[in-house]
Amino acid sequence: MTRRELIVSGPAGDPLVAEQMEALRADPSGADERELDVTEREAGAFQVELTGKDGSLMARWDNLVGVSELWAKIDATPLRRRQLREAAAAAPQSTRLL
C-alpha cells in the first residue's frame, strides 16, 4: 500500500514554507504514524496539499496548517480509523491485580 503525501509549495525562500516545514519537523512521529511523506516544492504561491493513499486530493490550504489540524484531518478518514481500531485491538491488554 502507498503512503499519504503532504506537499508544501511556495516561492523560493518563502518564510511560510519554512515555518510549515519546521512545524512538521517538530512532530516526526506523527507523520510516521500516519504513513505520511512530506515534500517541499517550489511554486508561485504558498500552498499545502494533502493526498490520500489512493492519490486523491484530501485537502488544500492556502495558509499555514497546524499539525493538530492536519493530524485530525487524516485521523478522520475511514482507513485511518480502521488502522487505529486494529492497533488498539492488537495492543496488549493490561491486567489489574487486586
Question: Where are the regions a protein language model picked out?
Answer:
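Non-catalytic interaction/Regulatory regions outside core domains
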Residues: 1-98
